[in-house]
UniProtKB/Swiss-Prot annotation:
GO terms for biological process: threonyl-tRNA aminoacylation. Belongs to the class-II aminoacyl-tRNA synthetase family. Its EC number is 6.1.1.3. This is Threonine--tRNA ligase.
């Protein structure tokens, strides 16, 4: 029998018979590992313990201690277990697909009756019975004709369609536990009992079109979440409860920040309070960019399709663009314009005006650019996913040798901005060259090394995401962590030699010849709308004083104090504090409650005692008790707190 060489993570290699499975490899190392093994990585591919290995490879055996692989398998197995439970409870239900998603999985079903909360309870109960039965998981490979015949005999038309889309010469993998089977790429655990029975929960039912196409049949999608332990599940459910309390849509209404309506789907109506947050954040970012050497520009929102065709975006983004047809005078045909879905091609147009020298580089062009993208109605979610948004967009035109320095400076700027906004921790992911790409390996080596060196230079932690870069260059993604532990991907840094080439950007080098600049796409917030939503939820509406839309309410206790209330408001406003008077004929406790719901950071209560002593009674949001202090002292303190940082 032919032999193959398997290399382990420690660098040691061993000879094995060709066709050996990872399960057999694990057992050959130790009885203990053979029992604990759940899957393997073979040349970087997640591999089922039952699959044969036919050639030399690098191998790593995974156990439940390997978080990423364990959770993927648990969630994948639960998708199958749920589908089996549904078909055992309601045999007429047809199954479709059930992938792993963030924190869990979903599965789409074709059923005439709507799944109810009681149905979800019954499904969960049956799932736990399947898990406790410890049914063995087995797998076979079939040819396409056999799989089609199998599913046609069972009336599983969705599965037939999936199989028909697979090339005729490709083997199809089938998985079983008990008498139930499904078409699946795998991998899976070895028996259903390896899934923790007390660490999952079915969450909700939603509508979903087959293959995401609204012209197809609408199915029912059941979502579930799963973790390795009961405690992790409880922590996640607690986080969801906290998230519901912090929902920016709920707080946005209470704080009178914004609204959305059917006549303008995905477009935000900013109210005075919300617009104040927006403008303050914009002023802050403008100041930070100016100090970092960026030049602010403004480019058109409506641009002819010719530019999008030249940039390559027409082919890739046309379906997500808002198009406008215009009949120009004396023109033979209508002009087709698009509301810009991104700013980068327009920034190249600004760069291209006038001859550039290497001495002009790096050139950093920034824009708070208004963009529009068509998002499906089902994907929109408050401020987090909209159709009209503004990016804190900037593009750096530079030489290859300048990439590392520009990247390091950007990471330091991003880190400082996030800290100012209350986010002390973030993750960096470096996405490297994909299989299909342009450019030489030497060029990719240089830019990937430049990004990695930049990260190391600033002392930041990072992970490498192999093969996930764009076809033209590597990128960095930045995920911040909010107050309840959620991750939000906001910042990006993308190296792009492609767009300058497509749109003719050039500079004169030291050698007197023309060269193409690199274009570095970068953003810190991502979009103002989404980031404001994140801020609202991170702070549960209790924004930092400098960012709060209504910073101070000066509330009278008696009407005789009204003139002094007006004086206090005027003194605060003169020092740049956003202050309002509340002289309504209401009890002070009522006023305090109302403004606390509106998340006003500071309430100054004014009665006759304060008038006579020229003091104010200070109440801070979320704190019990009050502090009495001289007016001048309080004005000075609040004026300092109101200053925009940076």
């Amino acid at each position: 029998m032919a032999q193959i060489s398997l290399t382990f993570p420690d660098g040691n290699a061993r000879e094995f018979p060709a066709g050996i499975t990872p399960a057999e490899v694990a057992a050959s190392i130790s009885t203990s590992l053979g029992k604990k093994a759940i899957s393997a990585s073979v040349d970087g591919r997640h591999y089922d313990l039952q699959w044969p290995i036919e050639a030399d490879a690098k191998i790593a055996i995974h156990t439940m201690a390997d978080e990423a692989q364990a959770l993927e398998l648990i969630r994948h197995d639960l998708a199958h277990i749920m589908a089996r439970a549904v078909q055992e409870l309601w045999p007429d239900v047809k199954v479709t697909i059930g992938p792993v998603v963030a924190n869990g999985w979903y599965y789409d079903f074709d059923r005439e009756e709507t799944f109810t909360p009681e149905d979800l309870g019954a499904i969960e109960k049956r799932m736990k019975e399947i898990i406790n039965a410890r049914d063995a998981v087995r797998t076979e490979t079939w040819d396409r004709d056999r799989a089609i015949a199998h599913y046609e005999a069972r009336g599983e038309n969705f599965k037939v369609e999936l199989v028909q889309a697979i090339p005729a010469d490709q083997q199809i993998r089938m998985y079983w536990h008990g008498n139930w089977q499904d078409l699946c790429r795998g991998p899976h655990l070895q028996h259903t009992g390896q899934v923790p029975a007390d660490a999952f929960q079915l969450m909700s039912v939603a509508g979903a079109y087959w293959r995401g196409d609204s012209n197809n049949k609408q199915l029912q999608r059941i979502y579930g979440v799963a973790f390795k332990t009961r405690d992790e599940l409880k922590a996640y459910l607690h986080m969801l409860e906290e998230a519901a309390k912090r929902d920016h849509r709920k707080l946005g209404k209470e704080m009178e920040l914004f609204h959305l309506q059917e006549e303008a789907p995905g477009m935000v109506f900013w109210h005075p309070n919300g617009w104040q947050i927006y403008r303050t954040l914009e002023d802050y970012m403008r100041g930070r960019l100016r100090k970092a050497g960026y030049k602010e520009i403004r480019t058109p929102q409506v641009v002819d399709r010719k530019l999008w065709e030249a940039s390559g975006h027409w082919e890739a983004y046309k379906e997500n663009m808002f198009l406008v047809e215009v009949e120009e005078e004396h023109a033979k045909e209508k002009r087709i314009n698009a509301l810009k879905p991104m700013n980068c091609p327009c920034h190249v147009q600004v760069y291209n005006q006038g001859l550039k020298s290497y001495r002009d580089l790096p050139l950093r062009l920034a824009e708070f650019g208004s963009c529009h993208r068509y998002e499906s109605s089902g994907s929109m979610h408050g401020l987090m996913r909209v159709r009209g948004f503004v990016q804190d967009d900037a593009h750096i035109f530079c030489t290859e040798d300048q990439i590392e320095g520009e990247c390091a400076a950007f990471i330091e700027l991003l880190s400082s901005v996030y800290k100012d906004l209350g986010f002390d921790s973030f993750e960096i992911k470096l996405s490297t060259r994909p299989e299909v790409r342009i450019g030489s390996d030497e060029a990719w080596d240089k830019v990937e090394t430049a990004l990695e060196n930049a990260i190391k230079k600033v002392g930041a932690a990072y992970e490498i995401d192999p093969g996930e870069g764009a076809f033209y260059g590597p990128k960095l993604d930045f995920k911040l962590t909010d107050a309840i532990g959620r991750k939000w991907q906001c910042g990006t840094f993308q190296v792009d030699p492609n767009l300058p080439t497509r749109l003719g950007a050039e500079y004169i080098g030291e050698d007197g010849a023309k060269h193409r600049p690199y274009m570095l796409h970068r953003a810190i917030l991502g979009s103002f709308e989404r980031f404001i939503g994140i801020l609202i939820e991170n702070y549960a509406g209790k924004l930092p004083f400098w960012l709060a839309p209504r910073q101070v309410v000066v509330a009278s206790i008696v009407s005789d104090a009204d003139p002094y209330v007006a004086e206090v408001v005027a003194a605060l406003r003169a020092r740049g504090v956003r202050a309002e008077a509340d002289t309504r004929n209401e009890k002070i406790n009522y006023k305090v409650r109302e403004h606390s719901v509106g998340k006003v950071p500071v309430i100054l209560a004014i009665g006759m005692q304060e008038v006579e002593g020229r003091t104010v009674s200070v109440r801070r949001l979320g704190e019990t008790g009050t502090e009495s202090a001289p007016l001048d002292q309080v004005v000075e303190r609040l004026a300092t707190d109101a200053r925009i940082p940076g």
